[in-house]
């Protein structure tokens, strides 16, 4: 389960995803129905601080104003002084990061509302999902796997496996090897357009030469929702993953383990 956290929940979170409350309800119902066959639950959690490259506190304009949420910051904007790092020591790192993003044709740097700040209510798992997670743990006598991501201040980390760009080239091999061990993998969470999609792509690219693994993966499409404006693009990308890697796209009601 990807980032089933309060800050992504509809009407209450700082980066709320429309449809997320119903997604969680369907996900917990699916987990309950399949309790006897669901071996393990792995959850990723966004875990941030205020001073990170995708938060407003990192940046100021020439007048000292911080950017508004959803501002896009480009390499040229920083190169020519439209935006600069609040801490001048970070400017060179920020320029390098933006250049790497743009040269790789990846996502643009978006300033997100402050979300999933470490230790806050918004960073916690949503309550009904948490209840089901630990009910599963008690019934199956297995500890849930919690994977924290997004703590590096100098980069974005949408996917569960690795950052968008990272000088250290960190890859979460523990997660990948856990995935390799299972007969079937079901992915749900928020948002389908960003962290779910990025996680799926990273996993599939790692196992791209082993269709016996990629074909085990199912996206529970009614247990995830996109950020507004990305609906059509997300559907097209999911269809492309299905075509290329043989994953399955199913409603939770269609999957009985």
Task: Name these PLM-found stretches.
Residues 2-42, 48-257:
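Active-site-adjacent betaalpha module
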């Amino acid at each position: 389960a990807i980032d089933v956290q309060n800050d992504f929940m509809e009407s209450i979170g700082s980066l709320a995803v429309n449809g997320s409350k119903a997604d969680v309800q369907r996900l917990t119902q699916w987990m309950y129905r399949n309790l006897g066959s669901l071996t393990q639950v792995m959850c990723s959690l966004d875990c941030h601080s205020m001073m990170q490259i995708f938060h407003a506190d990192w940046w100021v304009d020439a007048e000292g104003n911080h950017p508004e949420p959803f501002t896009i910051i480009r390499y040229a904007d920083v190169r020519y002084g439209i935006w600069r790092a609040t801490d001048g020591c970070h400017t060179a790192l920020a320029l390098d990061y933006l250049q790497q993003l743009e040269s790789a044709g990846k996502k643009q740097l978006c300033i997100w509302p402050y979300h999933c700040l470490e230790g806050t209510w918004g960073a916690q798992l949503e309550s009904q999902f948490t209840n089901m997670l630990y009910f599963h743990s008690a019934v199956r006598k297995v500890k849930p796997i919690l994977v924290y991501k997004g703590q590096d201040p100098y980069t974005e980390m949408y996917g569960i496996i690795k950052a968008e760009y990272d000088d250290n080239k960190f890859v979460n091999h523990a997660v990948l090897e856990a995935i390799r061990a299972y007969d079937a993998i079901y992915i749900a969470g928020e948002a389908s357009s960003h962290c779910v999609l990025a996680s799926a792509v990273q996993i599939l690219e790692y196992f791209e030469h082993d269709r016996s693994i990629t074909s085990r993966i199912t996206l529970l499409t009614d247990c995830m929702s996109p950020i507004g404006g990305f609906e059509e693009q997300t559907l097209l990308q999911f269809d492309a993953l299905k075509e290329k890697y043989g994953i399955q796209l199913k409603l939770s009601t269609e999957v009985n383990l």
